[in-house]
């Protein structure tokens, strides 16, 4: 039993966590975008990917600009976002794909 716990602890500490910050324009209102992102099916999808949404915010200077901070396994969110097949899914939320600024950090 002790050996199992030790190996599980090692797995947890060895996994690289990525924090991904997306800054982008919206094609709809911030409230519509936020509602979409917090919807049960959207959150279920993130949960299946091991991704958590830590922050969804609207720019004070431009109400059509939003920032979202995600955290999850390295490359998961980035790879999905960079896949051209994901573009229609991303844009269905109101997120304008073109011009999105992506900042990535690992820990």
Residue ranges of model-derived segments:
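Short S/T/G/P-rich N-terminal loop/turn motif that feeds into the first structured element of a domain
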Residues: 1-84, 98-107
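C-terminal structural segments of small proteins and small subunits
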Residues: 88-94
């Amino acid at each position: 039993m002790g050996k199992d716990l030790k190996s599980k602890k090692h797995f947890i500490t060895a996994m690289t966590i990525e924090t991904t910050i997306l800054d982008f324009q919206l094609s709809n209102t911030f409230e519509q975008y936020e509602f979409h992102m917090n919807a049960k099916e959207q959150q279920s999808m993130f949960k299946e990917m091991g991704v958590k949404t830590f922050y969804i915010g609207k720019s004070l200077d431009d109400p059509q600009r939003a920032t979202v901070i995600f955290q999850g396994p390295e490359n998961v969110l980035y790879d999905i976002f960079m896949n051209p097949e994901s573009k229609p899914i991303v844009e269905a939320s109101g997120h304008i794909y073109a011009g999105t600024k992506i900042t990535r950090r690992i820990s």
